Amino acid sequence: MHVFIVYAHPEPKSFNGAMKDLAISELTSLGHQVKVSDLYAMNFRAVASRDDFQMPQDKDFLKYASEQGHASKTKSFSQDIQAEQEKLLWADFVIFQFPLWWYSVPAILKGWFDRVFASGFVYGKEIGRYDTGGLKGRKAMLSTTTGSPEHAYTPYGMDGDIHEKILYHINHGILYFSGMEPVEPFVAWTPSRDEKDRDRYLKEFQERLRQLSEIPSIPYHPSSHYREDHQLKDEYR
C-alpha cells in the first residue's frame, strides 16, 4: 500500500513526532511504501496568494477558486502545490498527524488544505464532491493529540463530542468532501501528562497501523441520498 503521512507539529521531539516516526518505521517494516510531508520542516507556505499560480487567467483580480480551477486544467500550480498533489494521487491511504489546537488543525495544515485541495483537483462541476470527489478511492485517517482528557470530549462533555462536533468538519467537510473515505480517527488523550499513557498510546497506535486496511470507515451518506435542495431524503433519515 502507498501511505502518505502529512505531519504538522513544530517540535520534532514532540509526542506527535514520536507517532510520526513510529508510523514510518512500522509501515515500512510491514512492506508499505511511505512518503512524508513534514510541513514545518518544509517551511510550507500556508497563505493562499497569487503566487500559487504560474499562469493566472486574471492578473488584476484574484478569485482564488477560479484560479485553482484554471491551474488544475493547465497544470500550472506553483511547484510546492504540484508536489503535494502528486503525493495525494500516489497514495492509497493518507494519515494526518497533528495536535488538536483550538478544536481544529494547526494553521499550517489548514493552509495546506486551502492550497492543495484545490478546485478542479478534488472538487468542482466536472469532478463532483463527497463520494464523487477527485480523491475517491483513497482512505484517510486523522491521528491527533489533545490537551483535555477523554471525558471532556463526550456528547455531554465540556469540549464537545470528538466525533460529531470537533473532528466532523475535518472528516466530513474536508476529507469526505474531496472524495476520500475517512476511517475512525486515532486520538491520544493528554499524552503530555503521563509517561505510562504515552507508552500505551504508542503501542495502541502501532497496533492500529498493523490493521490499516481493516479500520472501519465513518458511514457518511453518499450524494445520492440527498435531494436537490441538499436535504437528506426522507427514507435515509
For each feature predicted by the language model, list its residue ranges.
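N-terminal beta1-alpha1-beta2 submodule of the flavodoxin-like/Rossmannoid cofactor-binding fold
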Residues: 1-98, 103-122, 195, 200-237
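Structured loop/turn residues at beta-strand edges in well-structured enzyme cores
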Residues: 89, 107, 135, 180-181
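Short, glycine-/small-residue-rich phosphate/pyrophosphate-handling segment
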Residues: 123-176
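Beta-strand-loop-alpha "switch" segments that mediate conformational coupling across diverse proteins
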Residues: 185-187
